[in-house]
Amino acid sequence: MSTDIHPLDQAVALTPTGAVGHYQGQTTQDYWNMVGPYGGITAAALVQAIQQHPLCLGDPLSITVNYAAALGAGRFDIEARPVRTNRSTQHWLLTITQPDQDGDAQVVTTATAVTAVRRSTWGGTDLAMPEVPSPAVVPRVPPLGGVEWLNRYDMRFLDGIIPQTWDGRETDSLTRLWVRDEPPRALDFCALAGLADVFFPRVWLRRAQRTPAGTVSITVYFHAGREELAAAGTGHLLAQARGQEFRNGFFDQSAQL
């Protein structure tokens, strides 16, 4: 591929494979994590499959991605199927499969999604934008952790950076940072889905202990439409996340961008 293509666009590039809603993609090293691709780029590829589908109604409203197994390096196949289409909403089932050593397709990721036609009505928010310094005066933090996908994002932490001392001291799990794609790229639904998984595991900050952790399931709600995303351009987004419950080997977090 041409080097003029943004790494995100290379990573979510899908080729139709004949049957409607069937696509083939290829993992890239640009978004590689410890044992597979960064979870956000997998979510972005699923959003791309929906938007590329000839029967797609409207724009993404939400997507839930369940990471059943690590996606291996190489080819993968996506099936995106609209199971119900209403006047304003459309409901989707998606799977990602890869061949095993015998060549049999094995499910590695499942997802559900909703797309919708947005109509102008009353709107409001109960979550105010925090007062924080602009990204121009917050220094960029060099990539942390030694995995390639961290090089794909410009991160400028305000609060809750990854622990500098792993001493087991418990603290609040809130992280705030300015973040955007690196190199800069105009914001769209695929990029926003990718950004939604940018937060390191809350348990690391909460306990300051090196604990094996990975995303099992993520849900993204797209409250912004095409116009709002276009207005954001290539600028930074303020991102924040906080854990809510840590129990019996699992934990959650609530995040906003």
PLM segments and residue spans:
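Terminal targeting signals and extreme-terminal segments of soluble enzymes
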Residues: M1-L257
